[in-house]
Amino acid sequence: MKQNRIVLGVAALVAAVMLPWPALGQEVGQQTVPDKESPAEKESEKPADKAAEHQASDKKTDGDWGFRWDGRPSLHLGEGTRVDFRVRLQSEIWHSDATLSLDDDSDADNDLSADVARRRIGIEGEILNIFDYQVERELTANRDPWRDVYLNYKQYGFAEVMAGKFKVPFSLDENTSSTNLDFVNRSRIATLLAPGRDVGVMVHGRFLPRGILRYELGLFNEDGSNAERNDTDYVHGDRTVAGRLLVQPFRSRKSVANDLAAGVSFTTSELPEGVSGLRGRTELDEWFYRPEVLVNGRRQRIGVEARWRPGPFSVKSEFIRLTDERLGESIEGTDLSPFLGQGWYVSGTWAVTGEKKAEGLDAPLRPLFRGPFFKGWIGAVELAARAERIRFGSVDSEISGAVPSTAPRAEIVLGNSDRAYTFGVNWYANRWIKIQLNLVRNTIGFPDQGPNPEQSSFWSRIVRFQFSM
């Protein structure tokens, strides 16, 4: 309830800042860093997206007012102030060789299933060239319907300030918008170990020539939406400090390496005493690890990431390690080895139709139905592959004489793991329509904890249909 009040307060502040001031946009708010990127949540949004959407805006006369089409409906309220209206629809069809129980009332196994994954509406834009803002709501969510609700002060590119509800600055994959993902689902480490969204405040910006060094540092109410559970018996991190540092050493050069980036990130949280909410699920939300481990102390994350997008290709990789302390949780009241979740992924893509990955494939070179005489082609086609692994257990997994156990106060926690290989094809018909097909091979370390105790490896097939404007 408190979080909802904060979110609604930020939304009201956005409206209050916008309405009285549109005529002043001609005189204030010039950015100090001309090539700076948008806020942290849009870290992975392609430069071509912004350029294409606001090409008309660059050509307008000073103080232009009214509705226009900038790739989506947009209301302009003078120079430097606009409201873009956004709609995002995503539906999925899937089938798995494993025994699925997404519908507890269903008696049929391995049936083809379908769902509307996202139905979101929202607004975003600028105010006087010195603020960015976004307000987005999920139409079908009964719990936590507000997604991104923030205001970002961007007048000084080396020290911008964002406040509201947005994604904690941790993990490249988690901070990539769902409309821009290379696969239907994020990696397991991003989904299960990264924080996700929370209410907080963050300072971020770029340093050094051409902004080759980027930082993000924030303070958040809790440990993020990914860590929350409906059952209040499970605990997650309270007040959280998070930071991320990203370097692009060749950003100022016109070379194939100018997009190469590497970064590190961390979070640290107070962790109240209770049962850890850390769990293991497959991409189809089937449990493969549900421990009842008592924790107490601090929750800490470290992450390492790298990305390179030369021409039509891309390569991305991450490593994430999360630990929950277990202070005083033994039967004798002594400390136990921290509870651990960690993993990695490596992924690659190839735009076979020739588009440059760093500039975005949602603006195909020859989109389907491009003009009034249909001089388009098939759009953009992309091949993708990803290998990943996530595992859970204790930090000290080899203590002499200790036997792994599922007991809440076990000295060594019995863990589990999931190794997955994903193969995908992405079709970008035009800037609004995208279809993704994924074939996934999962291998559960201890299948008796997974969706099918008699089957350690299984295939899943997923198709996503997306409309985004």
Kindly give the residue locations of the regions a language model identified.
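Glycine/serine-rich loop-strand microenvironments at binding/catalytic pocket rims
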Residues: 26-28, 33-53, 75, 158-161, ...
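Bacterial N-terminal signal peptides that target proteins for export
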Residues: 1-10
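N-terminal low-complexity, intrinsically disordered patches enriched in charged
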Residues: 18-20, 96, 173, 326
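Outer-membrane beta-barrel pore domains
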Residues: 46-47, 56-62, 99, 108, ...
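Bacterial N-terminal signal peptides
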Residues: 9-20
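N-terminal periplasmic/intermembrane-space "pro-region" immediately following the signal or transit peptide
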Residues: 21-90, 97-102, 212, 356-370, ...
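Outer membrane beta-barrel
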Residues: 71-272, 340-375, 380-397
